[in-house]
A protein has these predicted regions:
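Preference for long, amphipathic alpha-helical scaffolds in soluble/luminal domains
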Residues: 1-88
Length: 88
């Protein structure tokens, strides 16, 4: 877990593409989606979902808030369909 936390960028995003294979339930879909939309959005969404599902969200609340704020901004700026992201 700490390894993943250390990978978070100062803006709240994650960009290491290895994380797609590590956290995606549907790797093919996530890989294809990352070709259509900002790959950092896909990776960050995957990490946020993983933390929420598998770890104490209170302990990681600041990390999650920063990531979610970044996601919200990028989704709006790039007009990304959140339904597509929710399928990953």
């Amino acid at each position: 877990m700490q390894e993943v936390i250390k990978m978070q960028n100062a803006d709240g995003s994650w960009t290491n593409q290895v994380l797609i294979g590590k956290f995606s339930k549907n790797k093919e879909y996530a890989t294809e989606l990352s070709k259509k939309v900002n790959v950092s959005v896909v990776i960050t969404k995957l990490v946020v979902l993983w933390i929420q599902k598998r770890h104490n969200t209170k302990q990681y609340s600041l990390i999650l808030k920063k990531a979610q704020a970044w996601l919200k901004r990028k989704i709006a700026e790039e007009a990304i369909d959140e339904e597509q992201l929710n399928k990953i």
